[in-house]
From Swiss-Prot:
Name assigned to this protein: Small ribosomal subunit protein uS2
Molecular function via GO: structural constituent of ribosome
Keywords: Ribonucleoprotein, Ribosomal protein
Pfam families: Ribosomal_S2 (PF00318)
PROSITE patterns: RIBOSOMAL_S2_1 (PS00962), RIBOSOMAL_S2_2 (PS00963)
């Protein structure tokens, strides 16, 4: 399995870091060498760290924890939403709003506003308003859905946060660290691993690389979620007997 996975990682370019002049020295332990002035990531170190991260995330799901997937740059946005939905978890795939974790009380108020607008759009309230009022509410609804749609049913802070590109999502990492929420992240050679509890060294820019990571995670976590769900159903049936 690991040999096949390593071959797939090489095909996807997971081992390609950034040009050497952009490197972060803190990533030195995970670098294999240099080719054409580009750092090459040591996949023999990436693989076990990726496995460790997968196992810990599976434990989170097994014990009813909530995982927040974060990837707001264009190359990660669609895949981040897809993996979260595949395992019934949560996501932020557009702009990270400052205080999204550390100011959860205010964020929750915005989520309630979003849900209220959704209800209004379905219960006939919009039919009683002027076209201008409807347009304004639809614009606000779309804006809130765009920024909060992936966490509107989270119901509280997550138990873990998974990030694509630590440099890009440094605010999310800082907030998670402040609250003691474990951080899992793909970390490239130009980024700092500081604040990341579960480091996965790898290319965090190429779409093929990002998709490979997230597809594997999706398979593993959705399977875990399905098994947990089936276990709950079985327990309930046994109670009824």
């Amino acid at each position: 399995m690991d040999i096949a996975l390593m071959k797939n990682m090489i095909k996807a370019g997971v081992h390609f870091g950034h040009q050497t002049r952009y490197w972060n020295p803190k990533m030195k332990p995970f670098i294999f060498g240099i080719k054409n002035k580009v750092h090459i990531i040591n996949l023999e170190k990436t693989l076990p760290l990726f496995r460790l991260a997968i196992n810990e995330l599976k434990k989170t799901i097994k014990f009813n924890g909530k995982i927040l997937f974060v990837g707001t740059k264009r190359s990660a946005s669609a895949a981040i939403k897809s993996i979260a939905l595949s395992c019934n978890q949560f996501y932020v795939n557009h702009r990270w709003l400052g205080g999204m974790l550390t100011n959860w009380k205010t964020v929750r108020q915005s989520i309630n506003k979003l849900k209220d607008l959704e209800k209004q759009s379905l219960d006939g309230t919009f039919d009683k308003l002027t076209k201008k009022e409807v347009l304004l509410r639809i614009r606000l609804l779309n804006k809130l859905e765009n920024s909060l749609g992936g966490i509107k049913n989270m119901g509280g802070l997550p138990d873990a946060i998974f990030i694509i590109d630590t440099a890009y999502e440094h605010i999310a990492i800082r907030e998670a660290n402040h609250l003691g929420i474990p951080v899992f992240a793909i970390v490239d050679t130009n980024s700092s691993p500081d604040g990341v509890n579960y480091i996965i060294p790898g290319n965090d820019d190429a779409i093929r690389s990002i998709n490979l990571y997230l597809n594997i995670l999706s398979d593993e976590l959705s399977k875990c979620y399905k098994e947990k769900k089936e276990s709950i159903i079985l327990k309930n049936r046994l109670k009824e007997q």
